[in-house]
């Protein structure tokens, strides 16, 4: 039974490493020699995946689920990153030793592949294709950060909520033709925290959008009409 368990674990790890290889557009054979340095872990909703800088030695590949990464700067400001499956994180400090104060929490049940940050940095130095892919991913990460900040500059609360909804749809939403679906984790309280407004105000705005048939709650999921994007999204 032990042998079967180890075989199953190794097969799972190999499968996820192949998924990572596809994501960064390299042959699996490049990652295969380092399989013993990697791991696959499962996290339940609300569980902390890591808190940097105490746990900043790994890079993670989100295989399944949704996460929130809360980045704290020296002034105490909080920047939130939302991610769904098929994303590599955190990579902003991959090429320099700067410590990042970042709390990563599972918004839903999650599965992640972990590998040493030093290994990924080594692979980038040894392979130009990996470096170019990671550089593009870092730029995408910074663009997401910029879009989130731009949404927060909206003067009116309703515009801020709409732009934040659009931002979430573009980063963690699932394209369903006429609308985007945001799964499970989104709440009025989270929207009010993101927008910096009261829960009551956020709830009133969401209620208006529901009346306009632009937002629909389907059990725990949110369905957001693409018509909401017209002339407001960053």
UniProtKB/Swiss-Prot annotation:
Q: Annotated Gene Ontology MF terms? A: cAMP binding; DNA binding
Compartments annotated for it: namely:
Cytoplasm
- The membrane-spanning stretches of this chain are none
Please give the GO cellular component terms listed in this UniProt entry: cytoplasm
Sequence ranges assigned to domain HTH crp-type in this UniProt record: 155-228
Which Pfam families is this protein grouped with?
Answer: cNMP_binding (PF00027), HTH_Crp_2 (PF13545)
One GO BP on record is: regulation of DNA-templated transcription
Return the Gene3D superfamilies for the record: Jelly Rolls, Winged helix-like DNA-binding domain superfamily/Winged helix DNA-binding domain
The residues that hold a nucleoside 3',5'-cyclic phosphate are 40-129
| Signal sequence coordinates | none
Point out the DNA-binding stretch(es): 188-207
Which superkingdom is the protein from?
Bacteria
Looking up InterPro entries in the UniProt record yields: cNMP-bd_dom (IPR000595), cNMP-bd_dom_sf (IPR018490), HTH_CRP (IPR012318), RmlC-like_jellyroll (IPR014710), WH-like_DNA-bd_sf (IPR036388), WH_DNA-bd_sf (IPR036390)
Where the protein is mainly located, per its record? cytoplasm
UniProtKB keywords: Activator, cAMP, cAMP-binding, Cytoplasm, DNA-binding, Nucleotide-binding, Transcription, Transcription regulation
Keyword Oxidoreductase recorded: no
The free-text function statement in the UniProt record for this protein reads: Positively regulates the expression of the arcABDCR operon under anaerobic conditions, thus playing an essential role in arginine catabolism. May also control the expression of genes encoding proteins which are involved in anaerobic metabolism. Can bind cyclic AMP.
The identity of this protein, by name, is HTH-type transcriptional regulator ArcR
Organism whose genome encodes this protein: Staphylococcus aureus (strain JH9)
């Amino acid at each position: 039974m032990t042998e079967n368990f180890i075989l199953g674990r190794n097969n799972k790890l190999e499968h996820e490493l192949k998924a990572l290889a596809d994501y960064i557009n390299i042959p699996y054979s490049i990652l295969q020699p380092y399989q013993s340095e990697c791991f696959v872990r499962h996290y339940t909703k609300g569980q902390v995946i890591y808190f940097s800088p105490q746990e900043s030695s790994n890079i993670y590949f989100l295989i399944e689920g949704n996460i929130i990464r809360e980045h704290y700067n020296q002034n105490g400001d909080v920047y939130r990153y939302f991610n769904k499956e098929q994303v590599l994180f955190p990579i902003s400090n991959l090429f320099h030793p700067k410590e990042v104060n970042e709390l990563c929490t599972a918004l839903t049940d999650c599965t992640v592949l972990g590998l040493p940050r030093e290994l990924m940095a080594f692979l980038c130095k040894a392979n130009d294709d990996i470096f170019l892919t990671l550089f593009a991913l870092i730029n995408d990460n910074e663009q997401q950060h910029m879009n989130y900040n731009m949404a927060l500059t909206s003067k009116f609360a309703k515009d801020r909520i709409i732009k934040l909804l659009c931002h979430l749809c573009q980063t963690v939403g699932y394209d369903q033709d006429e609308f985007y679906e945001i799964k499970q984790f989104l709440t009025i309280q989270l929207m009010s925290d993101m927008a910096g407004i009261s829960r009551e105000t956020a709830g009133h705005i969401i209620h208006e959008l529901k009346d306009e048939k632009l937002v629909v709650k389907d059990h725990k999921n949110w369905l957001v009409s693409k018509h909401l994007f017209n002339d407001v999204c960053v």
